[in-house]
Curated annotation (Swiss-Prot):
Residues 111-132 are annotated as: Disordered. It holds the Pfam family GreA_GreB. Keywords: Coiled coil, DNA-binding, Transcription, Transcription regulation. Necessary for efficient RNA polymerase transcription elongation past template-encoded arresting sites. The arresting sites in DNA have the property of trapping a certain fraction of elongating RNA polymerases that pass through, resulting in locked ternary complexes. Cleavage of the nascent transcript by cleavage factors such as GreA or GreB allows the resumption of elongation from the new 3'terminus. GreA releases sequences of 2 to 3 nucleotides. This is Transcription elongation factor GreA. Residues 48-76 form a coiled coil. The gene is greA. One of its GO terms (molecular function) is RNA polymerase binding. Belongs to the GreA/GreB family. One of its GO terms (biological process) is regulation of DNA-templated transcription elongation. It comes from Oenococcus oeni (strain ATCC BAA-331 / PSU-1).
Amino acid sequence: MAEEKTYPMTAEGLAKLQAELDDLITNKRPAITSRIQEARSFGDLSENSEYQSAKDEQAFVEGRVKQLQQMIQFAQVIDASSASKNVVTLGKKISFKEVPDGDEETYTIVGSAESDPLSGKISNDSPMGKALLDHKTGDKVEIPLPENHSVTVEILHVSKAK
């Protein structure tokens, strides 16, 4: 039997996935079912754009529900407090600057299921996340960029994410 993929994530990330799943099941599904029933009442389904739109949305929601159930079932919640204080691991907040004179940047390392770079959460599977993992405060780390370029950063601070 094939081994199931695990989804490393923080407790906060797991809670967000569970909240999204609950919303889809308790709110979205019933709303879509109502839309489908209403669209059916319009008659001929072959040229009924409201019906087709609702069915498309239903398929999307059902796919997302299955995806969330899979990720929640095989979630591996990482406790950042058990790791060494100054070492970059999943669930840690990290500040670094580009060497020699870059601006300071701060990110939290999270599992790919909860990654959101625009809000400062980078995946442990991203090139940056992979490069930073297991390094500590004061380390200089080379982060790969596209087209065989790279940038060197110095880790300034590592702490447990809030």
